[in-house]
Swiss-Prot record:
GO terms for biological process: mitochondrial electron transport, ubiquinol to cytochrome c. InterPro entries: Cytochrome_b-c1_su10_fun. Component of the ubiquinol-cytochrome c oxidoreductase (cytochrome b-c1 complex, complex III, CIII), a multisubunit enzyme composed of 10 subunits. The complex is composed of 3 respiratory subunits cytochrome b (cob), cytochrome c1 (cyt-1) and Rieske protein (fes-1), 2 core protein subunits pep and ucr-1, and 5 low-molecular weight protein subunits qcr6, qcr7, qcr8, qcr9 and probably NCU16844/qcr10. It is found in: Mitochondrion inner membrane. It comes from the Eukaryota. It holds the Pfam family QCR10. The chain crosses the membrane at residues 35-58. Component of the ubiquinol-cytochrome c oxidoreductase, a multisubunit transmembrane complex that is part of the mitochondrial electron transport chain which drives oxidative phosphorylation. Belongs to the UQCR11/QCR10 family. GO terms for cellular component: mitochondrial inner membrane. Its main location: mitochondrion. This is Cytochrome b-c1 complex subunit 10, mitochondrial.
Length: 91
C-alpha cells in the first residue's frame, strides 16, 4: 500500500510552546566550553603542584640539577649549585 513516511510527512510534529527549547550545544567528547572554563583553573593548579613535586623530589639527581635547574634565570645560579668542600672530596 502506502509507505508510512508519505502519510506521516503530511502532518508536522506538534511542538508545544511550553516544552523545552532544545539547541545544539558544542562539545568535545561530552565536555562543553562552560565545563571546560570551570575545570581549567583547578586542573592548572593541580598540574603546577604535581610539577613542583616532581622537580622537588628529583632535584637530588645531578643530571637534572645541572641540565634543568641551574638554567633557571636568577634561581639556578644561587640555589641549585652544589659545591663540595675540598675537605669532603675523596680525590
Amino acid at each position: 500500500m502506502f509507505a508510512t513516511s508519505i502519510l506521516r510527512s503530511a502532518y508536522p510534529a506538534y511542538k508545544s510552546p511550553y516544552g523545552p527549547k532544545y539547541q545544539y550545544q558544542p562539545h568535545i567528547d561530552g565536555i562543553t566550553p562552560k565545563q571546560l572554563v570551570r575545570i581549567l583553573p583547578t586542573a592548572a593548579a593541580w598540574t603546577g603542584v604535581a610539577l613542583f613535586a616532581v622537580v622537588y623530589y628529583a632535584s637530588g639527581i645531578p643530571r637534572l640539577r645541572r641540565d634543568v635547574l641551574q638554567r633557571i634565570p636568577y634561581l639556578g645560579e644561587r640555589y641549585f649549585v652544589n659545591e663540595i668542600p675540598a675537605s669532603d672530596n675523596p680525590f
